[in-house]
Design a protein with these regions (language model features):
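HTH-adjacent hinge/linker in prokaryotic transcriptional regulators
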Residues: 95-167, 181-189, 201-206
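Catalytic or ion-translocation cores adjacent to nucleophile or general acid/base/metal-coordination motifs
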Residues: 192-200
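Generic hydrophobic alpha-helical segments
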Residues: 67, 150, 154-158, 179, ...
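Conserved beta-strand scaffold positions in the cores of enzyme catalytic domains, especially
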Residues: 132-134, 193, 224-226
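Short catalytic-loop micro-motif centered on adjacent basic/acidic residues
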Residues: 167-169, 332
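Conserved phosphate- and dinucleotide-binding cores of soluble alpha/beta proteins
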Residues: 52-68, 72-86, 91-97, 103-109, ...
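Extreme N-terminal segment that seeds HTH/winged-HTH DNA-binding domains in transcriptional regulators
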Residues: 2-14, 18-74, 80, 112
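Glycine-rich beta-strand-to-loop/alpha-helix junction loops that act as flexible
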Residues: 170-175
């Protein structure tokens, strides 16, 4: 991003600090950052009070304007500025920091649009989604970088779709963890958060639905209903025994009346259940033979968005796909990798109604749809 530097008599051009990063713009006027501590390695707050007073009295506004002009407007280094202003090089950083404190220099940031609106419009129109956020990612971004970017810029979008006092069902996932962590804090939202899936294993980690449910409830001043069961049990009889418990049954029923669900969309290729030792490669082959293309909350579904008929189906304790379809707003969150088949099937089956996705994934989804 380019810095635009302004003074009272001239518009500041592109400049930086000794080869400064081009991420901010500065102007020689008062502003909200006038009292912020200097980012150039020095701040007056680190000095004793007497030194601060002396320093402020020692430099005139005229000196500060000259130093700021030479440094920010003309792009001179601190050594050259020191010669012009007749001070030591070490004093230049003090001059520049004081210029900010007195309001002679102000920092502003040029607006950045993190979302790809054309792709959003196309996805919404072609796939019939209620709302879409396509987040731009830098070329060559790693999986972790894509997750971080989608979460950072997707969090406000997700928050806008969840009204105060709503019931929110939430699944687990790596991208979901980052997104929940970055949700704007609002203690007055008072949502009821419902864990949409039991714990994957005995080692409850930061990406599991329980931890994310608790984090969301804490950020939004809400209450939490936990599904205190394993996500996967040995057989249908064990599942039914858990669901027969009043405490578990109450949470299960509350899932049915959720206003919003926030879910990740998995594939057989990157299944967290294999990583956690719940499923084997052989299990995935069997699911693939039964037509599985995607997974939400441990529920594997086919190209039509219908749950695959397999022994696995009766071993899962999580929100059912039929329950999910009845929730008014289901937001799918995806970052990195081509999950087009899984996403398209989820949309076709009415499993998700809105989508947060990275730019590359959005393009792949449109190409998959056209083919």
């Amino acid at each position: 991003m380019i810095r635009n530097l302004h003074s009272t008599s001239a518009r500041l051009g592109e400049a930086g600090m000794q080869k400064r990063p081009n991420s901010r713009s500065l102007s020689a006027a008062g502003g909200p950052f006038a009292n912020a501590s200097g980012r150039y390695g020095w701040t007056a707050r680190n000095l004793p009070v007497n030194s601060r007073i002396n320093m402020q009295n020692d430099y005139s506004d005229e000196q500060l304007r000259l130093a700021a002009r030479l440094y920010y407007l003309d792009g001179l280094g601190q050594v050259e500025v020191a010669k012009f202003v007749k001070v030591s090089q070490a004093q230049v950083s003090r001059l520049l920091a004081l210029a900010r404190q007195r309001g002679i220099v102000r920092i502003s940031v040029a607006e950045y649009e993190p979302r790809h609106q054309d792709l959003e419009t196309r996805l919404q129109k072609e796939l019939g989604l209620q709302a879409v956020a396509v987040i731009k990612t830098t070329a060559g971004a790693t999986v972790e970088e894509a997750r971080m970017t989608v979460a950072h810029f997707g969090a406000p979008f997700v928050a806008s779709l969840i009204a105060p006092d709503s019931g929110v069902a939430i699944s687990g996932g790596r991208t979901m963890r980052e997104l929940v962590r970055l949700l704007p804090e609002d203690k007055n939202r008072r949502v009821t958060v419902v864990q949409a899936m039991g714990s994957i294993d005995s080692n409850v980690g930061p990406v599991d639905a329980f931890e994310l449910s608790r984090a969301m409830a804490r950020r939004w001043g809400g209450s939490l209903l936990t599904l205190n069961t394993p996500a996967f049990v040995p057989d249908a009889r064990t599942r039914d025994a858990f669901l027969g418990l009043q405490q578990i049954r109450a949470v299960w029923e509350r899932l049915k009346s959720a206003d919003v669900a926030l879910v990740g969309i998995g594939t057989l290729d990157n299944s967290v259940f294999v990583e956690r030792g719940i499923l084997s490669a052989e299990d995935l082959k069997k699911l693939s033979k039964r037509g599985a293309v995607g997974e939400i909350c441990g529920r594997f579904y086919d190209q039509q968005g219908n749950e695959c008929d397999s022994p696995w189906r009766n071993r899962v304790i999580s929100i059912g796909l039929d329950q999910l379809r009845k929730i008014p707003q289901v937001i799918g969150v995806v970052a990195s990798g081509d999950r087009s088949a899984a996403i398209q099937a989820a949309i076709k089956g009415g499993l998700i109604k809105s989508l947060v996705i990275d730019e590359k994934g959005a393009s792949a989804l449109l190409e998959h749809g056209s083919s």
